């Protein structure tokens, strides 16, 4: 068995969702890494911090750790922040 990071040049660029903690907190106004969400592709429930983060594109993409489906896209421009969450059935924000 080989280590995927040695054979896949993209694998070394993958972070976990915690890498986007600051961007997501600024966008949503709350700590997001512990927010659970359900993948629309496979039904897995994961916290945002557990998702696979790809940050080298113009923006950030968060993917399901189980099926690799795209759950969330975030793009920041000088004028606005765009969030595409169509890959999530839901995100669960607990009231405090």
Which residue stretches match the model-derived regions?
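Short, charged, intrinsically disordered terminal tails
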Residues: 4-9, 78, 85-96
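A charge-rich, low-complexity, intrinsically flexible signal that marks solvent-exposed coils, linkers
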Residues: 7-9, 13-15, 26-34, 38, ...
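Short Cys/His-rich Zn2+-coordinating modules
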Residues: 15-29, 44-50
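Short Cys/His-rich "knuckle" micro-motifs
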Residues: 46-53, 74-77
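Short metal-binding segments enriched for Cys and/or His
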Residues: 66-82, 93-94
């Amino acid at each position: 068995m080989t280590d995927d990071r040695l054979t896949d040049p993209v694998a070394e660029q993958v972070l976990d969702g915690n890498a986007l903690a600051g961007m997501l907190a600024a966008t949503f106004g709350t700590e997001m890494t512990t927010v659970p969400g359900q993948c629309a592709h496979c039904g897995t429930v994961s916290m945002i911090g557990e998702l696979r983060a790809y940050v080298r594109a113009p923006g950030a993409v968060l993917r399901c750790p189980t099926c690799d489906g795209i759950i969330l896209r975030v793009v920041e421009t000088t004028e606005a922040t765009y969030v595409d969450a169509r890959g999530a059935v839901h995100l669960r924000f607990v009231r405090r």
